[in-house]
């Protein structure tokens, strides 16, 4: 097996280069070029590489070359181990390590984009991301059954993303966790930790709940049912009184104790720091949402860490957004659950925090439903965990599932893949597109927000999670308001249709569906073009329900190019997209494979 350092560096080049090619439109795919063959005859193994990438960096008069293992119709390609560069017209070439390749690419962007960029910050994040991938790979390389097994639990899947977002330039960059604490808080290292508790007088508490009990009652009840909590603690703190108990992530608790306003509350006697207690909760893929299979609820915390592009903070409007999403399902909009019984939401129906004027206090805690309680945790996996690249020498989890089913059913992997994909679209894509066209409600359904429950290897239930992930179309405002008064206004989730179209297309189609299709293709299970045709057919079936002024369907089915989130440029300009209105990431025009590949097949 390759060394963890080699694996991490190759994964880093691959994700960064795929972002660069997509977002800048650079790169040539060369299959027959004698001059290049002459240069690389002794460098590339001709029997394993029939396609080269040639990427010209004109501003520096440099050309990068790499071997292409798999060229993808959805534009996430697989590259070989070796990269080389050529200066000007010289016939000599030099081998390039990952730092050299990425330095060249960042320098080219710096020259082309000029002011307003932050190349040093980007380079730092790339290196740290690579170092984290190396650590995760080294620690988990023998843990293949949990990473890629036919059967896994919810938390095993959540903790399986060793490489992270496959089309992000810094998928595992984290700023704010000390290295020696990484194992405790990182899902990739099976992190788990006790929660730290604060006791707050009701005069400074802000809580809401759409459940039968208040948030305070729910949290105290969880502690009373925890065998790891002492009777003395329960007797002292878990009674019905004028105080609330707030669980806080350990990193956030440490940060809060250094804040002057928190120290003032403690001095005034309205706040008490109790410390850690109870069972250890496990880190999910988002780091800040913690889970335990014996807890009725997951807990989503503010978290003083910058992950990929953004600080992870529960904003006040997001607390309300969780309740709004839960309330929405009790209106006519909730008919989507009856019409598509394989589709469901993981809601955030309660929250608690401390009042600190009009801004966040840092005590924001979101109560999230936990459908993966006890034995229900079996075979529930986020989509990103199915298609995550495997450690060299292993298959992805999706590949292992399809191969096992093919063996059991005496069918080809292609036949099983096609059936699996069709079943999956029935419980995920179809209900979300229907809800969007019918009610103007879009979900930020990317791979990490999408959890699928499997039965005998096949998808039977889809769950959407994320209280930050609702968009409501302005054109449907009157209808939505009739269902739920003031929907989207307090939470800031109402947008013009063209904005919602763009976001919905990226998250549901580019990130989620194209990402899943790419996972089938890169694993050699089925040609991506076949699944793209299936996807297009399903989208076409919704044309009779098309809703103006939305152009969601028309552009997907007709436009050669579409707006796609540019993770590299967003990172390059150091944009914190979660702190900006309209989720102000940078979007660029990219090729639409639903048009391009269908045209090629025709």
Curated annotation (Swiss-Prot):
Query: Where do the annotations place ATP binding?
Result: 286-288, 300, 312
Q: What class of enzyme is it?
A: ligase
Q: Which N-terminal stretch is annotated as signal sequence?
A: none
Statement on biotechnological application from the UniProt entry: The ability of the enzyme to catalyze condensation of citric acid with several di- and triamine analogs of spermidine suggests that it may be a versatile biocatalyst for the preparation of highly enantiomerically-enriched citrate derivatives via a novel type of desymmetrisation process.
Q: In which pathway does it act?
A: Siderophore biosynthesis; petrobactin biosynthesis
Q: Alphabetically, which GO biological process terms does the record hold?
A: siderophore biosynthetic process
The answer to keyword Transmembrane helix applying to this record is no
Q: What happens when the gene is disrupted?
A: Deletion of the gene leads to a decrease in siderophore production during iron-depleted growth and attenuates growth. The deletion mutant cannot produce petrobactin on iron-depleted medium. Mutant produces the petrobactin precursor 3,4-dihydroxybenzoyl (3,4-DHB) and bacillibactin. The deletion mutant is severely attenuated for growth in macrophages and virulence in mice. In vitro analysis show that mutants grow to a very limited extent as vegetative cells in iron-depleted medium but are not able to outgrow from spores under the same culture conditions.
| Catalysis: reaction(s) | spermidine + citrate + ATP = N(8)-citryl-spermidine + AMP + diphosphate + H(+)
* Matching InterPro entries: Aerobactin_biosyn_IucA/IucC_N (IPR007310), IucA/IucC-like_C (IPR022770), LucA/IucC-like (IPR037455)
An MF annotation (GO) of this entry: acid-amino acid ligase activity
Annotated EC: 6.3.2.-
Alphabetically ordered keywords of this record? ATP-binding, Ligase, Nucleotide-binding
The similarity annotation says: Belongs to the IucA/IucC family.
Q: What does this protein do?
A: Involved in the biosynthesis of petrobactin, a catecholate siderophore that functions in both iron acquisition and virulence. Catalyzes the ATP-dependent condensation of citric acid and spermidine to form N(8)-citryl-spermidine. It can also catalyze the condensation of several di- and triamine analogs of spermidine with citric acid and the condensation of the citric acid analog tricarballylic acid with spermidine. Required for growth in iron-depleted medium and for full virulence in a mouse model of infection.
What's the protein here called? Spermidine-citrate ligase
Q: Which gene encodes it?
A: asbA
């Amino acid at each position: 097996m390759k060394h963890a350092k080699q694996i991490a560096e190759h994964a880093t080049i691959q994700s960064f280069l795929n972002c660069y090619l997509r977002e800048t439109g650079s790169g040539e795919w060369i299959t027959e070029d004698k001059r290049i063959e002459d240069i690389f005859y002794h460098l590339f193994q001709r029997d394993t590489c029939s396609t080269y990438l040639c990427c010209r960096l004109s501003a520096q008069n440099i050309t990068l070359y790499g071997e292409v293992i798999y060229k993808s119709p959805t534009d996430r390609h697989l590259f070989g181990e070796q990269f080389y560069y050529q200066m000007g017209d010289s016939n000599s070439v030099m081998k390039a390590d990952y730092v050299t390749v990425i330095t060249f690419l960042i320098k080219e962007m710096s020259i082309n984009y000029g002011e307003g960029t932050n190349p040093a910050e980007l380079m730092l994040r790339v290196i740290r991301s690579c170092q984290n991938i190396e650590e995760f790979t080294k620690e988990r390389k023998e843990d293949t059954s949990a990473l890629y097994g036919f059967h896994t639990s919810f938390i095993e899947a959540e903790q399986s993303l060793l490489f992270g977002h496959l089309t992000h330039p810094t998928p595992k960059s984290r700023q704010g966790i000390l290295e020696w604490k990484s194992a405790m808080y990182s899902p990739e290292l099976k992190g788990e930790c006790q929660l730290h508790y604060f006791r707050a007088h009701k005069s400074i508490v802000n809580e809401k709940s759409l459940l039968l009990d208040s948030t305070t009652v729910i949290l105290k009840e969880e502690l009373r049912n925890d065998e790891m909590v002492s009777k003395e603690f329960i007797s002292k703190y878990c009674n019905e009184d004028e105080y609330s108990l707030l669980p806080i992530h350990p990193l956030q608790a440490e940060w809060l104790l250094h804040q002057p306003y928190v120290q003032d509350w403690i001095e005034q006697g309205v706040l008490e720091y109790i410390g850690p207690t109870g069972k250890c909760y496990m880190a999910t893929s988002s780091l800040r949402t913690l889970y335990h299979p014996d807890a009725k609820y997951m807990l989503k915390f503010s978290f003083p860490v910058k992950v990929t592009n953004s600080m992870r903070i529960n904003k006040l409007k997001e607390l309300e957004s969780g309740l709004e999403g839960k309330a929405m399902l009790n209106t006519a909009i909730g008919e989507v659950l009856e019409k598509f019984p394989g589709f469901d939401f993981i809601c955030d129906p309660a929250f608690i925090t401390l009042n600190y004027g009009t801004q966040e206090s840092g005590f924001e805690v979101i109560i999230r439903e936990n459908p993966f309680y006890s034995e229900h945790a079996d075979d529930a996996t986020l989509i990103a965990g199915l298609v995550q690249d495997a450690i060299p020498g292993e298959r992805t989890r999706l590949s292992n599932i399809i191969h096992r089913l093919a063996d059991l059913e005496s069918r080809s992997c292609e036949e099983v893949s096609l059936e699996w994909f069709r079943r999956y679209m029935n419980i995920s894509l179809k209900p979300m597109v229907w809800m969007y066209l019918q009610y103007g409600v879009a979900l930020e359904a990317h791979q990490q927000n999408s959890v699928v429950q499997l039965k005998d290897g096949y998808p039977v239930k889809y769950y959407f999670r994320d209280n930050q992930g609702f968009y409501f179309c302005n054109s449907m405002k009157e209808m939505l308001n009739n269902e739920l008064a003031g929907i989207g206004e307090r939470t800031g989730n109402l947008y013009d249709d063209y904005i919602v179209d763009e976001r919905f297309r990226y998250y549901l189609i580019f990130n989620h569906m194209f990402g899943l299709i790419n996972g089938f293709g890169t694993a050699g299970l089925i040609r991506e073009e076949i699944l793209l045709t299936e996807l297009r057919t399903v989208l076409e079936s919704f044309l009779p329900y098309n809703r103006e002024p939305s152009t969601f369907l028309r552009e997907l089915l007709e436009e050669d190019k579409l707006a796609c989130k540019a993770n590299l440029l967003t990172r390059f300009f150091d944009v914190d997209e979660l702190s900006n209105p309209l989720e102000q990431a940078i979007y660029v025009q990219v090729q639409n494979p639903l048009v391009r590949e269908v045209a090629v097949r025709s």
